[in-house]
Amino acid sequence: MITSQIWLRRNKVRMGEAVADLKLINSMAQDALIEFQQATSKPPKPPSARTIPKWLPPPSNWVKANFDGAIFQGNAEAGLGAIIRNDCGLVMAALTQVIPLPISVEIVEVLAARRALIFALELGFDQVILEGDSEIAIRAMNSDDYMAAPFGHLIADIKALAPHFRSLVFCHTRRLGNKVAHRLAREACNFSSSFCSWIEEVPVCTFADYSAEIINST
């Protein structure tokens, strides 16, 4: 910056223009440097706040059916879990089911989705959001190109149920937004029956997660 100020002063002398005293060159250079830094510097971007996934209630007059699956390798079984809640976050029904172990985790997830949807249909709900944390399963439900998948026939079953509902939406969430269904699936093998259901209540093992999701959804 000092060199540029001297160069500018020399040019002005050649042109016969008024120039600043040589003693001021250093301070003028410092001022120019500060001005340049202010013009070219960008304010640091504030750190982006990461949104923590959480369960959210469905629109008014809808229900949300969350599903999940779990693997019990030691028993060669799998657990299915589902919970249906209204637009206030209150439980309408929940279920667990233990089934023979399928050949893949994805099939377990799709079976859980199908069971949750059948459960909603059995209870007479006609505006349903079917939500789970398996991105593969939800993507297949929202696609027309699914028959090549190992679980394509199960997706076909789910799509065949769609006309029985006035409105049906397939939605993906993260595990943190699917805690109760996940807990139900994990605990399925701990109940006395291979199939259990609850109406307007949840089993004790899920109560902490269920209560937390109600509080966090408001």
Task: List each model region and its residues.
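Primary recognition of RNase H-like, Mg2+-dependent phosphodiesterase/nuclease domains
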Residues: M1-T218
